[in-house]
Design a protein with these regions (language model features):
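Short acidic-glycine-tyrosine-enriched beta hairpin
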Residues: 24, 48, 52, 91-111
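Histidine-centered metal-chelating micro-motifs
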Residues: 65-67, 86, 105-116
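A short beta-strand-loop-beta hairpin characteristic of the jelly-roll/cupin
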Residues: 72-103
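Ligand-binding loop in jelly-roll beta-barrel domains
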Residues: 103, 111-138
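A hydrophobic, small-residue-rich beta->alpha segment in the mid-to-C-terminal subdomain
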Residues: 138-156
């Protein structure tokens, strides 16, 4: 039996809108959003975990680098289940790191550390977990992007309206860092 909920984010969701309820979601059936060329699927968020962590997947094609950004209150995990991701991270002392993560590899980005990533192979999938004292940012993807019921990548990249970049990131603990340069060579 599948139970659907109406939440503040969408009229139909398999994720209960309040904490304390066990639930199960089949592969790919979480709350989905298209953002640029990617499909992001949320399985658990702040509402279910009392703002202690989130759990989501991000699937996409080989593409451009996701712009440098940081999260003031959120630690982030990158676990690659399929394909390859090049992860760029700068620690709080300014030292930069770059690592190609392939299936089964793990990367950790502490809060306040600038980071970016680029999917290096088509059909790449990242499992993301974020946690921190300020809550979680999983709804950023559907607020900047567009909610979807599709189970596939967008046929055409979804490019947000420029005005959304002024408000949505700030409201979701995402701070873009225009002009940030990676000195790692890739």
């Amino acid at each position: 039996m599948t139970i659907e909920y109406a939440t503040q984010y969408r009229t139909r969701s398999l994720i209960p809108p309040e904490p304390g309820k066990p639930y199960f979601i089949e592969k790919g059936m979480g709350d989905r959003a298209h953002l640029f060329g990617d499909l992001v699927t949320i399985y658990a968020g702040g509402e279910q975990t009392e703002n202690t962590f989130n759990f989501f997947t991000c699937e996409g094609p080989r593409g451009d680098i996701i712009p440098a950004h940081s999260h003031a209150d959120t630690h982030e995990v990158f676990y690659v289940t399929q394909g390859a991701v090049r992860l760029f991270v700068e620690d709080l002392a300014g030292e930069q790191y770059e690592k190609l993560l392939t299936s089964g590899d793990f990367g950790f980005v502490p809060k306040n550390c600038p980071h970016a990533y680029r999917m290096e192979r088509h059909h790449t999938q990242i499992v993301g977990v974020a946690a921190g004292p300020g809550g979680t940012f999983e709804r950023f993807f559907e607020r900047l992007g567009t909610p979807t019921d599709e189970l596939t990548l967008p046929a055409q990249p979804f490019v947000p309206e420029p005005a959304k970049f002024a408000t949505v990131p700030r409201e979701n603990d995402v701070r873009f860092l225009p002009g940030h340069e990676w000195r790692t060579g890739s």
